[in-house]
Regions:
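Conserved N-terminal catalytic core of the sugar/cofactor nucleotidyltransferase
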Residues: 2-58, 63-160
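Solvent-exposed alpha-helices and their adjacent loops that cap or buttress functional pockets
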Residues: 24-29, 54, 80-82, 133-135, ...
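Structural signal for hydrophobic packing residues in well-ordered secondary-structure cores
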Residues: 42, 49, 75-82, 103, ...
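Short, active-site-adjacent cap segments at secondary-structure transitions
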Residues: 44, 96-98, 148-150, 182-185, ...
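Conserved beta-strand scaffold positions in the cores of enzyme catalytic domains, especially
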Residues: 61, 111, 173-175, 289-291
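A short acidic, often aromatic-flanked loop/helix-cap motif at beta-alpha or helix-coil junctions
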Residues: 117-122, 182-184, 215-216, 297-300
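Conserved donor-nucleotide/metal-binding helix-loop-beta segment in metal-dependent transferases, i.e.
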Residues: 151-184
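Catalytic core of tubulin tyrosine ligase-like
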Residues: 189-301
Length: 301
């Protein structure tokens, strides 16, 4: 299915420059891509961003923890891990007032501006289709831009481990789970099971995702050693596409057809809003999703 989508998308202007002839650097393989997901509306924290920034901008464009915005902090965490031309940003057109300044030094070809916010399902799908036009062997890291990590070096090591895990297990999606330090009810949780692979990267099967559990449930998850879900998700682009074709066929097929006809806005207007990570990984977790445990001092805004 993924090869059919790549073929159907040919002829669409790529969002990234073709630099396949450039020699590799210390930033890892040129098949490694980072996609920063910055298209959310941030409705839950609008009252907070209003107090901090003086307007109701989405939280990724706000300095929630002081200093730089969450988006800028996310960029900084990834800059040593990926080639610059392999870093893409998925944003929403209505937020251009905010992201245009944040991304003023980023070439327009690396900014995927969605006509509307339709959740992570659409954001992941449109990014994958853009990448697969350029690199059929891509390994993609999807990173939400609404998290804070106190230990950026540990985060970088965890991302590298997740990439290695995805390369060792090409039919699996790998998700990072952060060590939980208290029974947080506003976070998603991951319950890990048996080992998928041990060396060199220990990868554990995800038995279940828990999205915003009750306090008694969160306490039980903490006692069982379950992890906070960072939603940092890694896998081969073709594996992601196969998952989307299985779980969200109407989304990825609609976007693929719309890209070929330059009718993306019309497709988005007809599309439901779907959170891929919260709603769609669960049914496939036992067979396709593995987790890596790490501790980088995560705090989700």
């Amino acid at each position: 299915m993924s090869s059919d989508l790549i073929e159907a998308g040919r002829g669409v202007r790529s969002p990234v420059e073709d630099v396949s002839g450039v020699m590799p650097s210390a930033r890892g393989s040129r098949h490694h891509w980072a996609v920063m997901l910055a298209g959310g509306d941030g409705v839950r924290l609008q009252s907070l961003t209003l107090r901090i920034a003086g307007d109701s901008r989405p939280k990724q464009f706000c300095s929630i923890f002081g200093g730089e915005s969450l988006l800028t902090q996310t960029r900084a965490r990834l800059e040593s891990l990926f080639h610059v031309d392999r870093e893409l940003f998925v944003v929403t057109r209505a937020h251009e007032t905010y992201y245009r300044d944040e991304l003023r030094n980023v070439d327009d070809s690396r900014i995927i501006s969605q006509p509307l916010n339709r959740g992570t399902g659409a954001a992941v799908a449109v990014a994958l289709l853009h990448i697969l036009q350029r690199d059929a062997d891509a390994v993609v890291v999807f990173v939400p831009c609404d998290h804070y990590y106190s230990d950026t070096e540990a985060f970088g090591r965890a991302v590298r481990s997740a990439i290695s895990g995805a390369e060792q297990n090409p039919n699996s999606i790998v998700i990072l789970g952060a060590e939980a330090h208290y029974a947080e009810v506003e976070y998603g949780w991951i319950e890990l099971g048996s080992a998928i692979s041990d060396a060199p990267v220990p990868l554990l099967r995800v038995n279940r995702f828990w999205e915003k559990p009750s306090l008694p449930q969160a306490r039980a998850l903490l006692r069982r050693g379950c992890l906070w879900n960072t939603f940092v998700t890694v896998g081969r682009a073709s594996t992601f596409v196969d998952l989307l074709c299985s779980q969200l066929p109407e989304v990825i097929l609609s976007i693929n057809a719309a890209m070929a006809e330059n009718e993306l806005e019309a497709a988005y207007r007809l599309m439901p809003t779907i959170d891929l990570f919260a709603a769609r990984f669960g049914p496939s977790a036992s067979s396709t999703v593995g987790g890596i445990r790490y501790d980088a001092g995560m705090d989700r805004s």
